[in-house]
Amino acid sequence: MPTGLVIMHWDERVGVEVLGAYPEEVVIQEKTLMQLYSQHEFTGEAGMVSLTAGAVNLASYYTGPESAVYVILILTAEEDGDVYEEGLAEITRQILMNLESDSLNSILPPLFQRLSVYPTLTEEQRYGMLLNSDVKRMLLNRLREETAISKSEISIWMKDQYREGFVDVENLLAGMVKLGLVKIASVKGLSSDLVFLTEDIMVLRTPPVELIKDPVDHHLPASLKDSYIKEVRNFFELYVPSEADNLAIIDKVLLDPACYEVIKLMREAMVTRNDLEKLRKKGVDDVDRVLKAMWETKMIAVFQDDKNNEYFCLTSDFFIERFYPRYNIDNIRQQYRTRSQNPNALLKALDMMKDEYYAQVKLKKAAAKKKEEVAAD
């Protein structure tokens, strides 16, 4: 696990400046900071370098010469800094946005907490982290409309959108490729590589199906069964999906390590306060804070039996998963009719969609075969 975070700035006149640290007592020797500075100077570009200093490893993310800020993560000797690169790039943007305010030190603890669990994030959390980034969400929305965009155009567009901020386009695209959402390819007749949308993400609330099927079997007293089912039904009769609602759940619950531990437990059963207190060993130090976050996002309800025992129940679960964007075919057809996209780019987009479709069919067949084999055993 990481042990600390240091924010450094390089000033040509005064040299190294430490702008913030978490925990506050964390210190990196100036000699080591100069070594990091030299390594970044050697590459000359924004990005990450790693350095071993005594008994620790350091992963340093540099924003480039314009802002000259270094976000340095302190790791144990056994940890590999490369697994934190995408997470470092994401929190670096948020740190730069708060450099000129008094809020820098107050945002470091939650950013450090999220970064610390980055290597262990589940698939749904990784999708959530992507959507929680305004930059990645903006690019995804544009790709949904245009199907393909050149890398050079993305770079220019991002610089125009975030003139005062920092966007590492290469890192941004690498993260989306890793999640299987986009592919990058060259197209005959075009000088810049194109970024193609190959998968999309669906996000919405869903009823906790397994809990509803048999609440009693999931540790809810029989006397509370009807009340629980009625609560879930009432919520979804009025539920209207919205981006604001999705982002609130992602930010307050899905990407909060303590809240996510509680969600995982509540997906399995109805719980009491004692059940939640047992999660302290998994990092749930403040049960009241977690319950407040889940109550405010309308994900839970509390029921009381005739002995005044309280049961905390999941009334709304959250679905976030990739899906094949069939709507892209209509987009491609429309762009061909209006000649708003290069014909070779549209043909490449169709080829990629075809490849993605058959790849998914193959995966589904393999999964079905494996299921049959397990059932036969």
Question: How should each PLM-predicted stretch be described?
Answer:
Residues 162-178, 281-297:
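Short amphipathic alpha-helical interaction segments
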Residues 122-162, 221-283, 339-354, 361-364:
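Short amphipathic alpha-helical interface segments
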Residues 189-198, 307-315:
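Minor-groove-contacting beta-hairpin "wing" of winged helix-turn-helix DNA-binding domains
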Residues 177-188, 295-307:
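A short, conserved structural fragment
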